[in-house]
Structure formats: structure tokens, C-alpha cells
Amino acid sequence: MSSYDVLRQGLNAPICLTWEMTYACNLLCVHCLSSSGTRAPDELSTAEAKALLDEWAAMRVFYINVGGGEPMTRPDFFELMEYSIARRIGVKFSTNGTLVDREAARWIASTDYLDVQISVDGASAEVNDAIRGDGSFSRARRAMELLAEEGFPFKVNHVVTRRSFAQLDGLHALVTGMGGQLRVTRLRPSGRGRAVWDALKLTQEQNRGLYAWLRAHPDVLTGDSFFHLSALGAPLDGLNMCGAGRIVCCVDPRGDVYACPFVLADEFKAGNVRDSSFATIWSESPLFERLRGWEVGGQCRSCGAYGRCHGGCMAVKHFTDTPLDDPDPECVFAPESGPTTTVIPLTLSPRPIRPAPAR
Amino acid sequence: MRRSDRVRLDDAVALRPEKFGALAYSYRDRQLFFIDQRLLPFVDSAGARQVGEIADELVASGELQEAAVPKLLTVLEGLRRKGVVHVVI
């Protein structure tokens, strides 16, 4: 049995568990997959969050991807991260970097089992700030500098768009020059991303260019984001499959469990940790059972590249009203859909950075 | 890997049982490893017994074919090179 078949049928616990700790954010990025900006009033309390971490430790979850919103806006952020690590659950947290001061940088650098990803969506303020908000590039860069001064090998996560594609080399040089590692991930039409999808998604020419660029830069991480591009030739590094409900899931700030961080929609909600245990939801939810038995069907099954891309990303299909058995809307064999101009006006504007809440 | 070697899991590696055997995760380099069911008794032996002794027992009980042992020891050697297990000295 191939690793694809083994993983498709689900595991005792997720490999990659995303915990969106809060929807509060001091930025308002135009492509935010969770439409973050405002704290949910019924967010999990510190005690509920700790009980969840206890459960994950019992399930031997190796690590969690912590995101949001901006996780550092939670007053109990450091407490919960230390609680997690003390239970041997490694933490990879995503931050916009605005709240990383020298004290936080020292804490990050001195904590084992902790990885940090700073979100940067362009190699210049002009490109980044149009998506993430005025001043966000310089604040993210400051966070990178502080971590570099502590000798900490931070990561930069870059959601590549048609506006930033030409800056990949520049961003790679900037990040690696500071001792960091670049991670490039796929834009999804999730959350507010739906409103800017047509304006920011890569052109087919850029998608082909990205495949070649990733092949030429094996040091660049992708979080298995671009498995739809593996149809172009030799597979990209990673499992090259949709892990939703199989090896991946997402817990939102209210404790709702979704199949993956990119499908925060009722159709993909498996349960809530306030109603039943996370372990029960993971192993018994009808939604997850269905996903584990399902494979993309339709015309993909007769495609020679099926074994490398497995039909692409479920979230991209869902939010573009594409049937799940159809090819990925960005299938490399599909004709270009929509304009190819690099700069198309955005229908949303990011908000300037809000003041940081007191710690 | 010699049959007289004893192996133990690296301190920074966590092991989780799965239907196919186990998943191993290294906190040191953030790598994930798939451990086949047949390999698990070796990886999880905590250095208590020689790998040849474990293999003989599995062969005797019919859980392993003698012909499969050299290949398993090669895979185990691969895990040693990647720092997942160490030979106990």
C-alpha cells in the first residue's frame, strides 16, 4: 500500500493540526483565509484551551500550527505556548510580526520546540502593504531583524500572488540573507481571499514558472501547498495530496473543528470541542469518515498526472463553486481563466495597523 | 547494522502508533518518518536487546520471514543515519 493510500484513510491523530487561537487581529489583510479582524466573543477560555492541549498531548499530536487572527493578541498567548511545549507538543506559530518586540524575540529564541513564521507578502512595502496594510512590511522586517539578532532561524511565510511572483528571488535573498528560511504557500479563495481571488491568483504562466522556481530552490518550504503543480513533472517535495480530515484539520477560536484551515465553512465542520472530545470528532465524525473514503473522481481519474496531484485542492474548488470531483480550478492543463494583467485593482483595502494591546 | 547491535530511539524523536506501524517525528529537524509495522519492535526496543535476537524471535513466531530480515536491518541502518535511532554503545 502506498503512503498516499495509507494516509488517505486517516491516522490516529492529525499530523498537521492548525489551531486558529483567535480571530482578533491588528491587521486586516485582503486575502485573510479566516476573515479575521475581530475577536469572537465566545473564544475558548484559557482553561478550555489548556484542556484541549492536554487532549492533544494524550493523542500524541507531535506539533500544532498556531495561527489566527494574530495569535499574539491573546493575553494568554505565552502561557498557552509554554503549556503546549511542556506537554511535548511542538509549536509552529504564524504571526504578522507586529507584536514581536525584543522581549518576545528573546523568549522565542530561548524556547525549544518552537518555530515562528512571519507573514510577508512581497519583497517591497509597495507590494506587501497593498495586501497587508500600510506599515506592515517594515514591522514584519523589524521582527525578522530582532529574531536574527537573537540568532534564531525564523521562517517567513509568503502567500505568492500575481503581484509578488516577480519578487520571489528578492524575497528569497532578503530572508536567507538574514538567516531565515522562506516558505511559499498558495493563495486560496477562502475567507476574504474569495473577494480578491481573481485579482491575485497566479496566471497559468506564473504557475508554470513557480513550479520551475520551487524545483530550483529545494531550501524553500511549501507546506505541501502546490501539489496541483506536481502534475507538471517530477513531484514537488511533500506528500502531494489533500490532507483535509485525513492528516490535517483545523480548530477555530470557538472550538469548531474543520477539515482544513482553508475550508472554514459549515459543510466542512466536523464538530465542536465543547460538545464532544477532539479525539471523538477526529476519529468518528461522519464528515471525516466521508473524506477518508473519498477520492477526486471525474475526468481527473483518466489523467496521466493523477498519481502526482490527486485532483488538487478541495478548498479552492469549494470557494470557486467548482464540483469537488472536477479538476482544480488552477489545474495546469486547464486553459487560462480570467485576465493575465499583473496589477488588477483590489476590491478590498487593508486597514492600517491598529495599536498593540497591552501585554 | 549488525545483528549484535542494540538500538534505541533518539531522545528528540516521538513515536505514535498507527494502523500501518507508527509515525516518528523528530523535534530536532522537524522530520516525519513512517515506521512499518515489521520495523516497530526494533525501533521501539529501547536498546534492551540485540536486533538479531529480536529478528530471530519474530521469525520463530512467524511474524517475519527470514528473507526479509536483511532488508529490515538496512532500513534500520537508514534510520540510524538520519538520527531517528542510535546504536547503543
Question: Residue locations for each model-derived region?
Answer:
Chain B
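Long, charge-rich, low-complexity alpha-helical segments
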Residues: R28-I89
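Long, low-complexity, charged/polar intrinsically disordered regions in eukaryotic proteins
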Residues: M1-R30
